Amino acid sequence: MENNNKNINTTNNSTTINTNNNNNPINKNNNNNNINNNNNNNINNINNINNVNNNNNNNNNNNNNNNNNNNNNNNNNNNNNNNNNNINNNNNNINNNNINKKNINNINKNKINNNNNNEIGEEKAVEGGFLAGLSRNVTRIIGSFSSGMAEESAGYPLDLIKTRIQLSQSGVSGGGGTNTSIIKIFKDVIKTEGVIGLFKGLSSPLILSALVTAIQFGLFEDTLKYFRKHQYFKNHDTLSLLFSGSIAGFAQSFITCPVDLVKIQMQIQGIPSSQPNSNNNNNNNKAKGNSYFTKLIYREKGLLGFYQGLSPTLFRDVPGLAIFFTTYETLKKQFGQPELSTQSPTEFIKSFIPIVLSGGSAGVFYHGLTHPFDIAKTLIQSDRSATKYKGTFDCLKQVYQNQGPKSLFKGFSAVAIKSFQSNAVGFLVYEMVINL
């Protein structure tokens, strides 16, 4: 019994449970409820989780909102700061505008003052430039005048001898004969007229030669400066020198012609009346002066009479001065530009050598190449009747036919010596004065 009961219980228990589980409606409902509850619980759990997540999200949102609020606050603060900065900037702009207005006023005042100062400065600059230019021109004029007087004085005795030789029938250039003629005429002048006779007629050409030299040098330098401004002549400087010298020669011919005419009339006073071309009153031993011959020429021929011999003068001076200045400038460059230093007597003398050699050589080239025209000028100007020669080339033709080709260089020995020494002295004086 006990065993059976046990078995039955066991079985019953199991069975009961199973039966209860399967067949009892309440249990089924309970189970369903439990299931539902579990589901609900699960749902609740899920909802709780969702709520937690929502809460977290809300917290995050709140944090974000707080951050945004903080950012907004920061932005507001920045905006406030910017507004303050803008206000400050506006104030600064206002201050700057005021300062700018003041600066503009000051600038305008300064401009007015500067304009006034510039006008004063320009006036002073013009005045300074004018004075500087005037000083240079005055120095150049003084140098030219001094050069002309020194040149004329140094070469005048030989110029007188040259004129006498050119007018004589016996003096022929070359060899000992010419040297004898120079010495002979030199002795004759001193014997018959004294030492002062070597300077007969000097007073008029002395002053006028200074004027001629001033015009000659001034015109040459100004013309040369003009030519050298042009690129073509910068690349062909020799042409600049030739053209400038030619222009200076053309201008000076209109001054030297009347001067030489009066000078030659005075120089031939000592020639014996038996010689042709003497045209003087030797019966009166008292020499006539410049004023006498100036009045005589004007009375007989008028103003145009002073330009007797202008044609050969132009033939001599236009190409002559072109050669003269070109030779001088070229040789001076070859010898080296001298510095007129006074450091010692030896250096002072050495600095003169390039000038002396350049100036003297230029004079010899000038008169050597134009000497036939100088002879024609002398013969035409010594013919007071102005009927013997029809012109320059007619004069040269007659000289050539009557006396041979050598006569075209009659008196050149005296001319060469005179040209070298007078032009050497002339350039030396000029360079010394303008470099002082």
From Swiss-Prot:
One of its GO terms (cellular component) is mitochondrion. It comes from the Eukaryota. GO terms for molecular function: L-ornithine transmembrane transporter activity. It is a multi-pass membrane protein. Solcar repeats lie at residues 135-226, 236-334, 350-436. One of its GO terms (biological process) is mitochondrial L-ornithine transmembrane transport. Residues 1-137, 216-238, 335-347, 435-436 are mitochondrial intermembrane. Pfam families: Mito_carr. Residues 159-194, 260-313, 369-413 are mitochondrial matrix. Its main location: mitochondrion. Keywords: Membrane, Mitochondrion, Mitochondrion inner membrane, Repeat, Transmembrane, Transmembrane helix, Transport. It is found in: Mitochondrion inner membrane. Belongs to the mitochondrial carrier (TC 2.A.29) family. Mitochondrial solute carriers shuttle metabolites, nucleotides, and cofactors through the mitochondrial inner membrane. This is Mitochondrial substrate carrier family protein Y. It comes from Dictyostelium discoideum.
